[in-house]
């Protein structure tokens, strides 16, 4: 009986304890849930990592709580690399989305919180300018591993549900650095 119980626990742990696609153990959250709309609809759940990037996670939680991420487009989506969103200043649907990727929020830019974690499939990082201390509201979700980003960008979480939705996001033009025409978007973002 004990062996059966151990086998069941190991089986349960193998299926439920790791983030979808990233191979990173799920933590206690908080979780950022993105309701996605556009050419693909569904839910993406990101396990945020306050132990890795406390200031960045706090800023994401605050912005989601204000509704700032609602109606923000996935403005830059590069097949095999990543999908970027979160420009709450210029990335709102119906606005000047051609400027998406250049804005932030009313909150201050954040100092880098680099870690020894790796950018693998499903990992979520903060977008920034060439200044490592310029991350604000924008973030990206990895389609595949990108070791050249390790230690250069702040990791804030990993996808634990809905990676198939991320995979189906409308891709951008590679010649235009992944800029997406008529992009998919975040209908509503919540944190639990």
Q: What residue spans do the PLM features occupy?
A:
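Cyclophilin-like peptidyl-prolyl cis-trans isomerases
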Residues: 16-192
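Bacterial N-terminal signal peptides
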Residues: 6-13
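Positively charged n-region of N-terminal signal peptides that target proteins for export
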Residues: 1-4
């Amino acid at each position: 009986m004990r062996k059966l119980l151990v086998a069941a626990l190991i089986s349960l742990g193998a299926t439920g304890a790791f983030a979808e696609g990233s191979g990173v153990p799920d933590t206690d959250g908080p979780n950022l849930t993105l309701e996605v709309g556009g050419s693909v609809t569904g839910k993406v759940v990101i396990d945020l990592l306050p132990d890795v990037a406390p200031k960045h996670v706090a800023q994401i939680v605050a912005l989601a709580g204000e509704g700032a991420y609602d109606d923000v487009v996935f403005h830059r989506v590069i097949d095999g690399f990543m999908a970027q969103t979160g420009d709450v200043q210029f990335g709102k649907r119906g606005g000047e989305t051609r400027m998406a990727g250049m804005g932030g929020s009313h909150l201050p830019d954040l100092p880098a919180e680099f870690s020894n974690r790796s950018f693998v499939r499903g990992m979520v990082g903060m977008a920034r300018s060439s200044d490592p201390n310029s991350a604000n509201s924008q973030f990206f979700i990895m389609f595949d591993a990108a070791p050249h980003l390790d230690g250069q960008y702040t990791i804030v979480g990993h996808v634990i549900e809905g990676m198939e939705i991320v995979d189906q996001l409308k891709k951008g033009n590679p010649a235009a650095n992944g800029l997406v025409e008529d992009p998919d978007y975040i209908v509503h973002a919540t944190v639990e």
